[in-house]
Design a protein with these regions (language model features):
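Short alpha-helical DNA-recognition segment
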Residues: 11-36
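A detector for short, charged/polar N-terminal pre-domain segments
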Residues: 1-4
Length: 64
């Protein structure tokens, strides 16, 4: 994790131009849960990571 506590999940979401609120809504999770995934304080379940790959339009996450 880098110095400002972002993860590749946050970086990919931001690169896709999607707000945290919108991403959480589209993923069917709370903003708090998404924030926990993005900060690295909660592991991202494999199926949720697959949903993020689809939503953010990046295959980079699929390789992680």
């Amino acid at each position: 994790m880098n110095s400002n506590n972002t993860t590749i999940f946050q970086t990919c979401r931001q690169a896709a131009g999607i707000t945290q609120e919108r991403a959480a809504e589209l993923l069917g999770i709370s903003v708090r849960t998404l924030a926990a995934y993005e900060s690295g304080s909660r592991p991202v379940p494999p199926l949720r990571a697959a949903d993020m790959v689809d939503l953010y339009g990046t295959q980079f996450l699929a390789m992680q």
